[in-house]
């Protein structure tokens, strides 16, 4: 029973390992939470945690690189890396967006980033944004003598289009791309993570849509589970909101 709650119980469920496809977060989630949440016998259900056997974890590639490789790429050690999201995130032309990126990087930031829904809209197509951001990046690098980065959002409507954007980012020579892993899907995210590892790109992850799944305390999936799934699927770091800002969170964490 759950302390202080009526008709709530904690259940521990174990599954044979052979029920799961190796290296597939998609299959793991389909098997564990794909159907049970819809059972009419349940009023609510929440997946609080997963304990994943080491033998299964080892079938996943995991993060493309990690913090040490990121610091080596940037040649920045012994301090936090400081960045910001470009605002207003929607409505700027690609040229004005690139200007904002330049001013932030020239002013001292290590990184700037696209926001989660900056994809390829009529006012700013993705290729134009990538080109102007790369120009801003290299201009700021030349003037400061530091290695800079901009998280180019490769999220797209199809996996093929997503990969096209990631490939173009690599051709421009930028150090990092980003992806919305929940709205984009685990299959797409894992494919992108594999490409990033093979081609030396860092991968930043945005958690857009997470609160639909994890915010209610008596139903859904705890974010620790979504974070474990992401670590298996692949991502070098994840957006978590500002320390004190507009997003819901526990202050003591």
Swiss-Prot record:
It catalyses: 2 (2R)-3-phosphoglycerate + 2 H(+) = D-ribulose 1,5-bisphosphate + CO2 + H2O; D-ribulose 1,5-bisphosphate + O2 = 2-phosphoglycolate + (2R)-3-phosphoglycerate + 2 H(+). One of its GO terms (cellular component) is chloroplast. RuBisCO catalyzes two reactions: the carboxylation of D-ribulose 1,5-bisphosphate, the primary event in carbon dioxide fixation, as well as the oxidative fragmentation of the pentose substrate in the photorespiration process. Both reactions occur simultaneously and in competition at the same active site. Binds 1 Mg(2+) ion per subunit. The lineage of its organism: Eukaryota, Viridiplantae, Streptophyta, Embryophyta, Tracheophyta. Heterohexadecamer of 8 large chains and 8 small chains; disulfide-linked. The disulfide link is formed within the large subunit homodimers. InterPro entries: RuBisCO, RuBisCo_large_chain_AS, RuBisCO_lsu_C, RuBisCO_lsu_C_sf, RuBisCO_lsu_fd_N, RuBisCO_lsu_N_sf. It is found in: Plastid, Chloroplast. The modification N6-carboxylysine is found at residue 113. This is Ribulose bisphosphate carboxylase large chain. Its EC number is 4.1.1.39. Mg(2+) binds at residues 113, 115-116.
């Amino acid at each position: 029973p759950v302390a202080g709650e009526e008709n709530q119980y904690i259940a521990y469920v174990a599954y044979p390992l052979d029920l799961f496809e190796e290296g597939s977060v998609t299959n793991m989630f389909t098997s564990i939470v794909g159907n049970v949440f819809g059972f009419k016998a349940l009023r609510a259900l929440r997946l609080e945690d997963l304990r994943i056997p080491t033998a299964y974890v080892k079938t996943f590639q995991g993060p493309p690189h990690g913090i040490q490789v990121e610091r080596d790429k940037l040649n920045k050690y012994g301090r936090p890396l400081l960045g910001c999201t470009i605002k207003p995130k929607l409505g700027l032309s690609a040229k004005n967006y690139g200007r904002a990126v330049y001013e932030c990087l020239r002013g001292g930031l290590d990184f700037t980033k696209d926001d989660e829904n900056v994809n390829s809209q009529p006012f700013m197509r993705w290729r134009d944004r990538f080109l102007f951001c790369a120009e801003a990046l290299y201009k700021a690098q030349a003037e400061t003598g530091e290695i800079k980065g901009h998280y180019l959002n490769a999220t797209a409507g199809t996996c093929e289009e997503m990969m096209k954007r990631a490939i173009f980012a690599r051709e421009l020579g930028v150090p990092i791309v980003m992806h919305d892993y929940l709205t984009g899907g685990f299959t797409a995210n894992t494919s992108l993570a594999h490409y990033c590892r093979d081609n030396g790109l860092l991968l930043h992850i945005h958690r857009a849509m997470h609160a639909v799944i994890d915010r209610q305390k008596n139903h859904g999936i705890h974010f620790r589970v979504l974070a474990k799934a992401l670590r298996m699927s692949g991502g070098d770091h994840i957006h978590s909101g500002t320390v004190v800002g507009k997003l819901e969170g526990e202050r003591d964490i």
